Every structure is written in C-alpha cells, then in structure tokens.
Amino acid sequence: MSTVTVTLPDGTPLEVERGSTVEDVAYEIGPGLGDDTVAGVVDGELVDKHAPLTADVELEIVTESSDEYLDVLRHSAAHVFAQALQRLYSDAKLTIGPWTDNGFYYDITGVDIDEDDLEAIEAEAEEIIEEDLDIERELVDRDDAFERYEDNQFKQDILETEAADDEEVSFYTQGEFEDLCQGPHVESTGEIGGFALLEISAAFWRGEEENETLTRVYGTAFPTEDALDEFLEQRRKAEERDHRKIGQEMDLFSIDETTGPGLPLYEPNGKKILNELSDYVAGLNRDAGYDEVETPHVFRTELWKKSGHYENYVDDMFLLDVNDEEYGLKPMNCPGHATIFEQNSWSYRDLPVRYFEDGKVYRKEQRGELSGLSRTWAFTIDDGHLFVRPDQIEEEVLATVDIILDTLDTFNLDYTVQFATRPEKSVGGDEIWEKAESQLESVLEEQDIDYVVEEGDGAFYGPKIDFAFEDALGRHWDGPTVQLDFNMPERFDLSYTGEDNEEHRPVMIHRALYGSYERFFMVLTEHYNGKFPPWLAPEQIRLLPVSDDNITYCEEIQDELDDFRVTIEDRSWTVGKKIQQAHDDRVPYMCVIGDNEEEAGTISVRDRKEREEKDIDIAEFRDHLETEVEQQRTAVTFLAGR
C-alpha cells in the first residue's frame, strides 16, 4: 500500500499508510496520545479523528488540552440542543448547527419558539447531558441519506451541494437522535460540563434574504460549570456596555428599518464624537506629510474591473443601473486613490506620495451578520495610501506604525499584533516578497512589538501587519492595519521615472489607523462604557442652576466657556435630581450654580468620578479644561489631588 507524509507541528515528518486516520497517527506517535485524541487539525481544518489521510498533510492532534477542543465540545452541544428541541417539538426541522467563536447556533424551522421557551429546552438539554449518551459516527450511502431526509429540503440541499461528489456521508447519533454532519464531536454528551442557551434571532437559509426565513438559536458550552459561569458573567458585563444600549441612552446613533439595515444615523451627540475623531486623525496625517483627497461614493464598474474588485467582490457590491450603464458604490477607497496618482507624471524624487481620505464605503454584508456599528453596510474608513519606491518601504512602514502606536496610546487601548506572510496564491516575485516581509518584520523588531506570525495569511497582493484592539473586557476587535500591495500598481500601470530615466513600478501601502470609524466608535463606546474622555465627550460640562433665578448667571458662564460643549439643565428639578441625571448621562463635569456662587463669581465643580464639589474660579477651571482637552487625556483630572 502507498504511503503519505504527515508533518507534525514541530516539523517532524511521518510516513503512514494512505488512508490512515488521524487517530491511527496519534497511536503511532504514542498510545497515550492515541487514547486522548479527540479530533485533528488537517491543513488548518478541524476534522473528525476517524478522518482518513489520503494525501500529504500537516497534522495537529487535538486533545482536551487543545484550544480546538472547545470548538469540538460546542459542536456536540449544538446537537444536544437539536435533540432536546426535537424531544419537545416533534415538528421541528433542523438545518445547520455549527460552532462559533463563543458557542454555537442552530438554524431551525417548523416550530414557533421565542425567548420564553429557551428555559424548557435548556432543561431538556441538561437531561440529555446527564444521560451521558455515546456520540457515534456512521457512514451512510448518499442515496440512503436522501431517503432519511425526504421531508427536509434543507438537508437535501446540503447533500446536493456540499456532498454532491461523495458516495458516502457521515451521520452522528446519540440515543434516538441523528444528524447529517461532518463532525468532529466529543465521545459522549456527558463531557459537556456547562450548557446554556443565550438568545434567538431570525436568519435566512444560506444567508440569502430571498430564501426561507429560519429561527436561529444561539447557545454556548464549556467543559465545566465554573467556566460557563465565568463566561456568563463576562457576557453580563458586555451587555451593560453594549454600544447599542449606550448609543440609545446617550442619543449617539440609531439604525432605523425605514432607512435600511446596516445604515447608521448619527445623532448630534454621535456626530460631535465623530468630528473629534476625524480632526484627531487628520492632524496626525497632516503632520506625517499626507495630502487629503476626496473621491466620489460611486464609480463606473469599469474602474472596479480594472482594480479587480468586480471579479472578486461583485457579490458584496451595491450596483446601480444609470442610463443603461453599470455603476457601483465603492467597497474600497484604494482604486480612487490609485486613479488620482495615475493623473500625474512622477519622478523618483517625488516619492513617497501620501494620500488620505475619510472615505465612505459600502459592502453588502449578509443581513443576518449586521450588528449595531460593528458590522454595517455603510461605513467610513480613515484610509491612507502611500506610493513608494521599494527602498522606502521600511522607512514608511516604520513611520506608519509610529502613528498607530501614538493613536492606541491616546485612547488608552491595549492591542495585539499579527504579521501575515505570503499565501500560496500571490502576485509578485520571490525577491520582492522576501524583501518586503523582512522589512515589515524589521519594523516590528525595531519597535520592540510582540507579534504573532500568521504564516500564509497575507493578502495575495502583499504581506501585512494587523493590530487588534483589546478593550476593557479583554475582547479583541479588528483595528489598524498596514498592508503592502504589489498588485494594484500593476493593474493600474502606475509608474515613476527612476534615477536611470527608466520607468519603475511603485509599491502601494494601504494604511488605516482606526480601521473603520463605525467599529472604532463601537470599541470606544464599550471600552469607556460611554464615559468618554472630556475631549471626546459630546457634552463636556453641564451647568446646574439651583433655582431659575440662577439661570442668567449660568448663561454668562456658558458664554465664558464657549470653547467647550456646555449645556444648562434648566428643568425645574431639585439639585440632587439634576446631579443624578448628569451622572446618568455620563457628563464629565457638573457645575452647581447657586446664589453663593453667583455672589462670589465662582462655580462649584464636581466630576462624574468624584462625588464631592470644589468651589473654584471660572478662569482656573477654563484653563485646566483647555489643557485637558489639548492633551487629549483619557480621564477627568480636574479634582484629582485637589
């Protein structure tokens, strides 16, 4: 029998018989590992431990101590949910039930359930876990599988598409329950130590709105009850900080079904924050030698064909028919910037050329994936594009990373960094890739940045450095990026005249400091829990007159503080209620103004952190706030140490 080469994570090659399973290889490495094997990761894909190896592969054995074990456990938990559902609702029809980053979901139809029904389903699931049912894999003839699902068009659709070329398909059974599934799964339902159902939402089959509407039930699972409790507590904290909740409380933004899903409407308070964010990044760009440009929201599709986006992204684009000519809302800003560069003749002395734009883009995400500001159809990217000589790459990337680090420091955000290298399919020669990767890695080393190398995870057009924000709850969000691009200059035939009087191809660098304004707005809202630093806060100071007689004096103070965002609470409330409301509204500074303050020409200041008041001179307060805003401090500091 022929053999295949299995390469282990440490690089060790093993010659095994073709058709050997993941579990067979584990036993060949050692009997203890074989006994502990739960699944395998074959060429990056999580598979069942009984999966046959028919070609040379890279293999990682998954045990209970592996990160991937949680995915396997949650996949089995999805089946436990489905079994519990069918025990309680015999008409329930199952579609798909994958694991996710935080748990699992299962899309169902045939029954009408809501959040109130989850408790009973969860209780039945706990019974199934208590029964400790063996989970067994069975290979079934594909035609037989069609017969088993003669009343389930969704499973038949899977058999006709994903399994179209398979003679046999796998089913997993536990007790009376069975499901068409590729796996992998744990050995028994009793391995699930903590199980919870979380929420219900609507979904569409295959994620397409024209298909059947389904009910999606989300859940999670852990090896222990303690781990589940910790997750649920973290989830509770996250719900308290949910930017959608805070956005409504603070009148920051809204999303209205009348205007369309994934199309946020920024209210005055939200727009004030956006303006500050935009001014901040514009200042950084100008200081770094960028020129601001502007491109339209829509282009003829000829541009998108030239850039390659039409070929690769057309399904995610919003297309328009204008006088029998096709246009597309822009999904990215880079083709417009490349076109601007294309308008001029450039010498090697002119480079680098740096453009920036707060450019609105549009991407047709699946409706079920839209969520607040984290996933939208319309969003704004603080896009920067640099056109550089190959010998300028390292210097420009270093300067860009410096700006990114300054930005993260300004907002007091921790971060992680990934360095993504050349994928199997790529454009550009070996020499330029090797040099570019070396230059990017050199920048990270020079900045003493801890990073993870993601082998083969770069874009097809160049390597990249990705930063991920870490918020106050330890969650990670996509953030700044620096990407080299050898492809677009080629597609647009961009060039500059070199010192040798010959035409040369520049390298394009894509760069964003926030990623997108929408996601960054979301991250900041949840990171600060709505308590924005004074320089960002939509309302920086609220004046609280003790009585209506003090309103005129408050108006005079408002005029003196006209460089700041100041409001007057003129409702006929008690001072205590006014203070409490200002705290609830997360206003950084509150100034109580009564007869004593008016007679003395002072104000009584308190901040949202300190619960005591200090009588001070208006000019002193103004001077401090000017410093606090100019230095973009992340906390209220006026009363600290006074």
UniProtKB/Swiss-Prot annotation:
Q: Catalytic activity, per the record?
A: tRNA(Thr) + L-threonine + ATP = L-threonyl-tRNA(Thr) + AMP + diphosphate + H(+)
List the protein's name: Threonine--tRNA ligase
Q: Organism, per UniProt?
A: Haloarcula marismortui (strain ATCC 43049 / DSM 3752 / JCM 8966 / VKM B-1809)
What do we know about how this protein assembles, alone or with others?
Homodimer.
Which InterPro entries does the protein's record reference?
Answer: aa-tRNA-synt_IIb, aa-tRNA-synth_II, aa-tRNA-synth_II/BPL/LPL, Anticodon-bd, Anticodon-bd_dom_sf, Beta-grasp_dom_sf, TGS, TGS-like
Q: Which GO terms describe its biological process?
A: threonyl-tRNA aminoacylation
Q: What is its EC number?
A: 6.1.1.3
Q: Where in the cell is it found?
A: Cytoplasm
